[in-house]
Amino acid sequence: MNRVVYGLLLTLVLNVVRGQSFWPALSSDSLIALRSQRDVLSNISIDKVPMVGVQLNEVAFRGTSNETESLEILASLLNVGVQAYMMDIEFDESYNLTISGSDTSLGTTLSTFKRFISSSNNYLNADMLVLLLRLKQNTNTSTKGAPSNFPNITAILDLYLGSSTLYTPSQLAYDRSSGNVAPSYGNLNSPDWPSLNYFLYSIQKRAVVFYVDTASSDALQSPAIFNASNLNYETSNTPIVCPLTNNAQVLNTSSLSWRFLQKDYSPSDIREYTMCGYSPIIDNKYNPNSINTISNVLENSLLWSWASNEPNTSDDTRSNSTSLVARRCAVVHYTKSNSSSYWTVANCYDRKRALCKRDGNDFEWAVTQEGASYFSHHDQDGNGFCPDNFSLSLPQTALQEKSLDNYLSQLSPEGWEIWIDLNSVSVPDCWVPDGPYASCPYQKEVSTRNFVSMITPVSVFAAVTILMLIMLSWRRVPIQDNRKRWKRVINSHLGSKAEGVPA
């Protein structure tokens, strides 16, 4: 029995400490990596933010008539970091909007998004969601001849999602007229949109809704929804230039807003399209029995920045070049054989070259000629290391990372590790740019989270121990049950002893 109890205890503790990487929940390392990736995007305009999406009809609602199962899959997709959701919607016989191919109403589906937004509406976890709608024709109803029967989709969004969370065309017009937009370095022809930081924290919005075709916007007009002219929504039938092998191709792609590519992806090709500047819309067909296989596709697309199992700060191996160890600084590791790069954690005291970016251009790079520690590169803002008109920097989007790969391929380095402007020196697990003295924007939340993660296993152990003690207190000890019988045995034994002093 003791083995069973302690086995249960060990399982509980391990389940608290560990977690699956990308499905149905994020491991702690994956969560930290995604959060740092979001933070380096803070000054990027929201139309250029790389994200991963799904065709919700195929991924969550296909192969089941169980509404609860489908909505649980949607909740898991939200929790692991999927941000864009393509939804085919249609009218039922009563002209209610439903998810095409299911009996689930659009309002019920939006309620799942609303619950997620409410639970993640804090500095630590907030991120942008994009909803992409397409109204489909069915045999029971028609969008022609009965417009008075159509539901008010603006009212549906307000009731089930919340208008306060939505970024609308009128808000965009105001922000453009007020200058609340992000600069478009390197792509002057790109339309202006606000930065992710302004979107999430200044005006506290969480979602943008688009129609993907003009037929949908004509049938269901709404001041809360952007029309298809704002999108660059491509499918597998559209010829796409990928991979991007030169800066001219990179700049052409960067000028496009809201770049989405819907197709059936494999784990191997989804990263390539992500690095080409497109946000993939996963069109793979899943059902409740196979949905766990989406993990491999998500792993190769959600994180375009960090390598697998990074950021890993736990290795305390001494450096060959210094006796000091502080694994709190990031490098970009370039692999010549496949012309690709990932971020990894390195000892801040190691001597390495550093990455510089031209001021006012997101796609022009340089590498310092001299190697130095991370701290030395940031002394006096790195003066003397970067070329003129360049500053210490890092790739902020997947497309910028691709342009960096193209630049490094011309230098032909073999296994280079180059400092990028990213560190967690100030607060563990809070990765920030602007040098080692930069403060963590959510230091209080991180400290609280670290404290909770530290005491949770202990709390579980204590709870199980208390439970065992309570169980033992309910179970009566056998000698108490047979008290009278044992008393008679003892008295009989004492009476049988010989009296007097032995000779």
From Swiss-Prot:
GO cellular component terms, semicolon-separated: membrane
Chain ranges on the Extracellular side, renumbered to this chain: 20-450
Record's bilayer topology term: Single-pass type I membrane protein
Main location: membrane
Residues annotated as signal peptide: 1-19
Entry-listed glycosylation sites: 43, 66, 96, 140, 152, 227, 252, 312, 320, 338, 389
Topological domain spans for side Cytoplasmic: 472-503
Function: May be involved in telomere capping.
Disulfide bridges in this chain: none
Recorded superkingdom: Eukaryota
Protein name in the entry: Maintenance of telomere capping protein 6
Species of the source: Lachancea thermotolerans (strain ATCC 56472 / CBS 6340 / NRRL Y-8284)
Compartments, record wording: Membrane
Family: Belongs to the MTC6 family.
Alphabetic keyword roster: Glycoprotein, Membrane, Signal, Transmembrane, Transmembrane helix
Transmembrane annotation, as ranges: 451-471
